[in-house]
Amino acid sequence: NKISPNPKHTYKIVSSNNILLDAADKIVDEKNMDIIVMGTRGITNDKKITFGSHTLQVLKYVQCPVLAIPNHYKYKQPKHILFPTNYLIPYKRRELKLLCEMASPFRASIDMLYISRSETLSMRQQDNRNFIKDELHKNIINFKTTNDKNISNAIYTYLKENSIDMLVMVNSRLTFLESILFKTTIDKMSLYLDIPFLALQNISRENL
């Protein structure tokens, strides 16, 4: 299909006979890409699979934020964004700025969901929380807490009960996303995404 013209964007078609993951990593590195946008379904289009295998590989391993768009998703402005976190890892300024710039034109509110049995934060967690607040200063930030023992269920419940338009998570060790990405069926995940999903990367990268 022909891409509609947009004065704010230019489009270039890139062809590669390489493996998708390798090709994506190469162009991200060469062009210092800010974000990858892709669909969530592969050739099988299996309704029991949340992400296609290609999407999973890119989400987990490419050193760049990835915005995954569900199959048959109808565009709507992202007015309400969910960002589950444990506040245990330092966040990248560049990637939080990306989220801020994506959300601010729509005056979106961002719900930071802390999933824990205790609302008390360590000094490290408090520092990371303050950093997020500073970097997302253009947006309305709501700090929420839930004590649900099942992370996937906690996220799924919050998505459905609060009319969330976009889910944001960080791909790193010791984060919620790491465990969720390795569970692909609805029965295992209890999380079926029908909204855009932005995966930020806590991976070393040059030119940050």
Each language-model region and where it sits:
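Structural beta-alpha unit
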Residues: 2-36, 137-187, 191-195, 202-208
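Residues at the starts of beta-strands that form the adenosine-phosphate
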Residues: 10, 79-80, 107-111
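Intrinsically disordered or low-complexity boundary/linker segments at protein termini
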Residues: 38-40, 60-95, 191-208
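Glycine/threonine-rich flexible loop motifs
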Residues: 45-50, 177-181
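Charged helix-capping and loop-helix junction motifs
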Residues: 51-54, 126-129, 181-186
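Short, structured coil segments at secondary-structure junctions
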Residues: 54, 62, 106, 136-139, ...
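Active-site phosphate/pyrophosphate- and oxyanion-stabilizing loops and adjacent acidic/basic residues
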Residues: 56, 100, 130, 156, ...
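Redox- and metal-dependent alpha/beta enzyme cores, enriched for Fe-S-associated oxidoreductases
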Residues: 93-137
